[in-house]
Amino acid sequence: MAASETVLRVPLGSVSQSCYLASFFVNSTPNLSFKPVSRNRKTVRCTNSHEVSSVPKHSFHSSNSVLKGKKFVSTICKCQKHDVEESIRSTLLPSDGLSSELKSDLDEMPLPVNGSVSSNGNAQSVGTKSIEDEAWDLLRQSVVFYCGSPIGTIAANDPNSTSVLNYDQVFIRDFIPSGIAFLLKGEYDIVRNFILYTLQLQSWEKTMDCHSPGQGLMPCSFKVKTVPLDGDDSMTEEVLDPDFGEAAIGRVAPVDSGLWWIILLRAYGKCTGDLSVQERVDVQTGIKMILKLCLADGFDMFPTLLVTDGSCMIDRRMGIHGHPLEIQALFYSALVCAREMLTPEDGSADLIRALNNRLVALNFHIREYYWLDLKKINEIYRYQTEEYSYDAVNKFNIYPDQIPSWLVDFMPNRGGYLIGNLQPAHMDFRFFTLGNLWSIVSSLASNDQSHAILDFIEAKWAELVADMPLKICYPAMEGEEWRIITGSDPKNTPWSYHNGGAWPTLLWQLTVASIKMGRPEIAEKAVELAERRISLDKWPEYYDTKRARFIGKQARLYQTWSIAGYLVAKLLLANPAAAKFLTSEEDSDLRNAFSCMLSANPRRTRGPKKAQQPFIV
């Protein structure tokens, strides 16, 4: 086993094959006893009694368990998985994708309103209430249990899929909307367990090809496995098996996992009022380890976080390596959340000072250099290049010819957005939805910029939302650009998956941003649009074509974060005040520091620099 594995030992002969472990709906936390087994291994015993339970009807199936009424019955001891009895019908694209001509023709086909076309051509209608009920049932079916307690939700529960890959695992980023949905519903245990168990995984040894990344790295995903106990066939052990990118397609590093973990931790405290979790010594240490990894000194001259391609929601090669907006927005949000939660102590003074300095610099950098509107495009169009000066206007030596032809006519007179990436001599002018929305939520964007982003989305509704919210980025790369940048990725063909596909899970971020800015009608319109199809389409992972007419050619059905994203949007629209659990407001200290930077001489301070003290974690 890997180092520091977390184990539950269950004697096979001591209980029947169907063991009542825990109830998901009862606020109960298992009693766990820690017993060191070896230097790099730790055992977790569940001391709750195991008893056979009589169960009522109405069972829900998941990948390794059955939820019956309000009781959970484990089927792990049988080494079996339940087959889903209901056959699912779906409309999928050919595996080789669609030609551009066919996509254009299909985009002109009308879609039914308030329903989807069935096999006999008749429209089927599903009420809003029934959609929510179905979504909650599906979300609870996706719950994964460990030590008798809910610990997360699997990525997808698609019974039609012939290849599971890693969709049966609990992904950190995928669980965020699920966790928020449970928090807003008043079901807190699953989020608390998720936070604490993933924290244990942070300290695991992570090695790929003899190289180990930083200690604070959070896993991309994990899976609950049941294996025979070494040396004792009469015992089994439940093992948390994490993936830090060693097994992921492309071996991508999950940079966003730790950032999302901090954001969820803060949301848990805000929503429950229980600050005891974030004040725990091990949780405080986990926060500091993530910050230490993110704030480490490097060669970069920018305050933004330098990452490789595929390090966030867009986890395939899409030309976002460098300083992608999504990572910067999550980074800023995590810094703000950590600033609230870190307990004051002597050992944290230097870390908090570095955190505050980075917040101010990052805020200034994104607002000044990532912002794009019609005025800024005209400014770039007139840029002088090859400027060698401390007060150069074109600091990053951006060539005006980089302005893409589509952008000139696409940018509305009113509104703007934050570009996708910025590096020396390179600006990625694509609109990335998650990065822009989370910049609003976290106050990385200014108040005026936040309203302008929403103005932009409204002005370009037909392109960014079309028939199913919400495009992950716009526009899609096509032709030679697609071949060079994606490496001819067959999954990221134009207007599919990460390359301009529509992702329903983004509904919840749009809702939080809209409510924060006092414009909930934007989210209401998007949710109403999604309700026309998403249930009858079996909750797909993403949609294809320019107007999102088809279920994605490789999209999983019953994708958990599509389900959870819809539920969070509905819960927040029903109770807009709850959005404050997720948003951050710019405080006066940061605002004053930002104003000072704007008015200061752009020439950098020169001279010897005082040595910084290392962070002690």
Curated annotation (Swiss-Prot):
Disruption phenotype: No visible phenotype under normal growth conditions, but the mutant plants accumulate decreased amount of starch during the day. Transmembrane segments: none annotated. One of its GO terms (cellular component) is chloroplast. GO terms for molecular function: endo-alpha-N-acetylgalactosaminidase activity; sucrose alpha-glucosidase activity. Keywords: Carbohydrate metabolism, Chloroplast, Glycosidase, Hydrolase, Phosphoprotein, Plastid, Transit peptide. The modification Phosphoserine is found at S87. The keyword Plastid applies. Its EC number is 3.2.1.26. It is found in: Plastid, Chloroplast. It catalyses: Hydrolysis of terminal non-reducing beta-D-fructofuranoside residues in beta-D-fructofuranosides. InterPro entries: 6-hairpin_glycosidase_sf, 6hp_glycosidase-like_sf, Glyco_hydro_100. Changing C294Y: In sicy-192; inhibition of cotyledon greening when treated with sucrose; no effect on enzymatic activity. Expressed in roots, leaves and flowers. Residues 1-45 form a transit peptide. One of its GO terms (biological process) is sucrose catabolic process. Pfam families: Glyco_hydro_100 (PF12899). Belongs to the glycosyl hydrolase 100 family. Chloroplastic invertase that cleaves sucrose into glucose and fructose and is associated with the development of the photosynthetic apparatus and the assimilation of nitrogen in seedlings to control the sucrose to hexose ratio. Participates in the carbon flux between the cytosol and plastids in leaves. This is Alkaline/neutral invertase E, chloroplastic. It comes from Arabidopsis thaliana. The gene is INVE.
